[in-house]
Each structure stands twice: as C-alpha cells, then as structure tokens.
C-alpha cells in the first residue's frame, strides 16, 4: 500500500508543481527561409528509433501505473489517445507490479486497449535481467525503458542511496533483452560523458530527459519533512542535453523530453539531433484537467503545427528537419562553449 500511495502522490505533486524551469529552447532560433520550395501536403512526419518505425516523432512518455484503479484509468485513457493517433506509449515503472501482482492490470490495460500499438515497458536501473524480461512480457512490449533517477531517489524519503553497479546491470539487460533498450533520464538531463558510457555498453537509444519539465526533485521535496531544496534546480536543460548527446557522434537514436509542450519545441528538438520527442507532464495535465477528448484534439494540433513549421523551413521529412540551419544563443550557447562543444555546426549547415 505504501508504494501505491507514493504513486498517487507523484501524480498529485507532479500536477501541482507544474513546469516552472526553462528547457532552453528559447535560446534556439531557426534561420528563416524565404524560398522554402515546399508544400504542406507533401510533409511527412514518420521517424525511427533504432529499428522501430514510428508514424510520428511525438510519443507519450512514462507517467504512471501501480497506483490502483486511478492509475489504471489514467493509463487506459492515455492508451486510447495513443491508439487514436498511432503514437508510441511508455508505461510508468513496473516495479510496483513485479512486487504486487494486483497492480499488473494498471499496466496491462495499455496493451489491452491498443493491441497493435508500439508500447514501451519501464523499470528503474536497479532492475535485474529477470525483472526486465518480466516487465516486457507483462505488456508484450516493443521496447524497454530503463530510467536513471539518482536525484529523485536521493530526494525521495524512502528512496535508494546506493547506485553502484548501475552501468553493469544495464549492460546485462542490453545483452539479454529480446527488445531494444532505451535508457532515459527523468528531468535532470544527460551529459555527453554519460551518453558515451551508455554507447560503449551497447545501448542503441537514449531519452535525455532534460531539465525543464516535471521536476521530480520538487515533487519528492513536497513529500519530505526537511526539504533538500538544493536539488530543485539541479540538472542540464533539455536543449543543452540534446546537443551534448549529439556531440558524441554515436549512432544511437536520440529521444528528447523535458518540458516539451509545443510543435515549435518538437521541431527545435529534432533539428538539434533528436529522432523523436516525448510528452509526459503536459499531456497529463490536459488529460486530468480537460479530459481525453481535449488531449486527442491537442495531439492533432501538434501534428498540424509541426507540419506548418516544417513547411516554412523547407523540410519535407524528419531527416531534412535535422539538417536545417539554426542559431544557438544565450545561456545555452555559454553552457555549450564551456563544455567544449562548437555550435557553429548548426548555424552553417
């Protein structure tokens, strides 16, 4: 019951704390193209994460599950949205269902609603090879997310305090998994060094989960008697983290998440190097406050607006969007300069 209570508290505080931190996309500006030689009707948005083909670069990221009927109902509605728009969808951490079998349905509902969709299983980096297999089998997943959440765990009153051996555990899962493994952050971003470490052990896809979206340090601090407020502003902003990851020149697929709310955010993330973008808190707030039909409408508008932006930039598809020129300025430019990353590549291509 304690785990179920925590899952429900996470939803409550995620909704109440909002997205108050900047993701850095305000520092990214496209170079206007007066002669784009493009047509809205010819713009397509298909993309790939590794070997997985997606009809959209937008997908529903891991949010919940394991909190009884309420989380089952949330996942059910999100699955209907995913099915309606042919979006990939990730479930929240399934460790709750591995510990408490009565919670299995709160995750399995996603596959029941969307039997032919692309669904991602999800576990923390403490997971074993056997637990990873069980999580994938539970929802007949097409891929497995392994989330890295050191700051959240440290801030969580009942969280983990020992993070030794994480890279080796992930490597073991990668070597034995029958589905692709996506390693993701949860709002604190990934550095180029972390990305390189993951590439070295055979990880083929990452979700940088940058600073700017749901603040899990703030969420966990709401549950503490003594706040660890120094973690509330911890992390690498989403825009900077995408560029850090891209600078490693690896072949791994890059997913951008962390405060993404608009089609312009999506376009900028892809132009910086992402193959796909993931929405969590923004979609959850619409679902909880305005309902499933409104969320379905919002996703439709996101796709329309993304195609408008791509038309303006002369990009007929996602690969062409990844090559349009843009300028990096402000705090993001200064961060990347200090990190030894040359942003001229983006403005001169």
Swiss-Prot record:
Entry's Gene Ontology molecular function annotations: FMN binding; isopentenyl-diphosphate delta-isomerase activity; magnesium ion binding; NADPH binding; oxidoreductase activity
Residues bound to substrate: 6-7, 152
Keyword Metal-binding listed: yes
Residues the entry annotates as binding FMN: 62-64, 93, 122, 184, 214, 258-259, 280-281
Signal peptide: none
Taxonomy, superkingdom: Bacteria
Subcellular location: Cytoplasm
Main localisation: cytoplasm
Record-linked Gene3D superfamilies: Aldolase class I
UniProt GO BP: isoprenoid biosynthetic process
EC number(s) recorded for this UniProt protein: 5.3.3.2
Catalysis performed (reactions): isopentenyl diphosphate = dimethylallyl diphosphate
Cofactor(s) demanded: FMN; NADPH; Mg(2+)
GO CC annotation: cytoplasm
Assigned keywords, A-Z: Cytoplasm, Flavoprotein, FMN, Isomerase, Isoprene biosynthesis, Magnesium, Metal-binding, NADP
InterPro entries (UniProt xref): Aldolase_TIM (IPR013785), FMN-dep_DH (IPR000262), IPdP_isomerase (IPR011179)
Residues that coordinate or bind Mg(2+): 153
Family statement drawn from the similarity comment of this UniProt entry: Belongs to the IPP isomerase type 2 family.
Cited HAMAP family: Idi_2 (MF_00354)
Quaternary structure note: Homooctamer. Dimer of tetramers.
PANTHER family reported for this sequence: ISOPENTENYL-DIPHOSPHATE DELTA-ISOMERASE (PTHR43665:SF1)
Function per UniProt: Involved in the biosynthesis of isoprenoids. Catalyzes the 1,3-allylic rearrangement of the homoallylic substrate isopentenyl (IPP) to its allylic isomer, dimethylallyl diphosphate (DMAPP).
Protein's name according to its UniProt entry: Isopentenyl-diphosphate delta-isomerase
UniProt source species: Bacillus cytotoxicus (strain DSM 22905 / CIP 110041 / 391-98 / NVH 391-98)
């Amino acid at each position: 019951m304690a785990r179920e209570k925590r899952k429900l508290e996470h939803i409550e505080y995620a909704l109440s704390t909002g997205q108050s931190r900047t993701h850095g996309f305000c520092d990214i500006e496209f170079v206007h193209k007066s002669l784009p030689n493009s047509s809205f009707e010819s713009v397509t948005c298909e993309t790939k994460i590794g070997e997985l083909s997606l009809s959209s670069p937008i997908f529903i990221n891991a949010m919940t599950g394991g909190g009884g009927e309420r989380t089952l109902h949330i996942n059910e509605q999100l699955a209907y949205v995913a099915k309606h728009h042919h979006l990939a969808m990730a479930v929240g951490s399934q460790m709750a269902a591995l510990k408490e079998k009565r919670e299995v349905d709160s995750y399995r509902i996603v596959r029941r609603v969307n039997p032919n969709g692309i669904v991602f299983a999800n576990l923390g980096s403490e997971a074993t090879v056997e637990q990873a297999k069980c999580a994938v089998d539970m929802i007949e997943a097409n891929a497995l997310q392994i989330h890295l959440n050191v700051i959240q765990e440290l801030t969580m009153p009942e969280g983990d305090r020992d993070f030794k051996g994480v890279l080796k555990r992930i490597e073991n899962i990668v070597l034995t998994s029958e589905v692709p493994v996506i390693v993701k952050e949860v709002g604190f971003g990934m550095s180029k060094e972390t990305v390189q470490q993951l590439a070295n052990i055979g990880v083929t896809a990452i979700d940088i989960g940058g600073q700017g979206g749901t603040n899990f340090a703030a969420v966990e601090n709401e549950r503490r008697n003594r706040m660890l407020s120094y973690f509330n502003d911890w992390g690498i902003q989403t825009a900077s983290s995408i560029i850090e990851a891209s600078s490693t020149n690896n072949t791994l697929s890059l997913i951008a998440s962390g405060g993404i709310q608009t089609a312009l955010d999506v376009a900028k993330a892809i132009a910086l190097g992402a193959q796909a973008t993931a929405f969590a808190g923004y979609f959850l707030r619409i679902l909880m406050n305005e309902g499933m039909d409104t969320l379905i409408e919002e996703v439709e508008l996101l796709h329309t607006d993304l195609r408008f932006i791509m038309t303006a930039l002369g990009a007929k598809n996602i690969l062409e969007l990844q090559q349009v020129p843009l300028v990096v300025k402000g705090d993001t430019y200064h961060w990347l300069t200090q990190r030894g990353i040359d942003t001229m590549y983006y403005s001169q291509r």
